[in-house]
Amino acid sequence: MARFRGSNWKKSRRLGISLSGTGKELEKRPYAPGQHGPNQRKKLSEYGLQLREKQKLRYLYGMTERQFRNTFDIAGKKFGVHGENFMILLASRLDAVVYSLGLARTRRQARQLVNHGHILVDGKRVDIPSYSVKPGQTISVREKSQKLNIIVESVEINNFVPEYLNFDADSLTGTFVRLPERSELPAEINEQLIVEYYSR
């Protein structure tokens, strides 16, 4: 299944979550798109709830179904709670870390920065968004890329960096200090529904 490339605004409203991370999609119209959006009261089945939760998280991270399922399966082989391990693995992706450091305003921008070779991990260029960052590794911006408007503007307006990360705005360098705790990750996601979806 290909990565979704349609309107993130419509998809955000349908799923009830900001896929861009800015929240603008839901400010004026916090309901599903379409003629009957504000009045839709259709009750989802158990399967429908599980599917919607899976889609919310998959679209949030901009992943294909295969990438998403593979990450889910890897999480299941780790010690601990499957759903929490899954959320932690997603938050450890390089594009997710770049976004959380404030180097990009949206996850899509963060993915593009990685794809285009603007990001370094421990001083070496890594252009794979799904690269799993390990505790202690440093994430920085290539010297030639440090004046890109997308990066400069993102850093200027960002006023929050999660506690599992350290970030120096002057050098545009961050450190993945430790694995995040579940409480530090998206609260609007019920990962147990996703576990149930894939356990059918």
UniProtKB/Swiss-Prot annotation:
Domain of life: Bacteria
Protein name: Small ribosomal subunit protein uS4
Quaternary assembly: Part of the 30S ribosomal subunit. Contacts protein S5. The interaction surface between S4 and S5 is involved in control of translational fidelity.
Domain S4 RNA-binding intervals: 92-155
Keywords: Ribonucleoprotein, Ribosomal protein, RNA-binding, rRNA-binding
Organism: Staphylococcus aureus (strain NCTC 8325 / PS 47)
Membrane-spanning ranges: none
InterPro entries registered for this protein in UniProt: Ribosomal_uS4, Ribosomal_uS4_bac-type, Ribosomal_uS4_CS, Ribosomal_uS4_N, S4_RNA-bd, S4_RNA-bd_sf
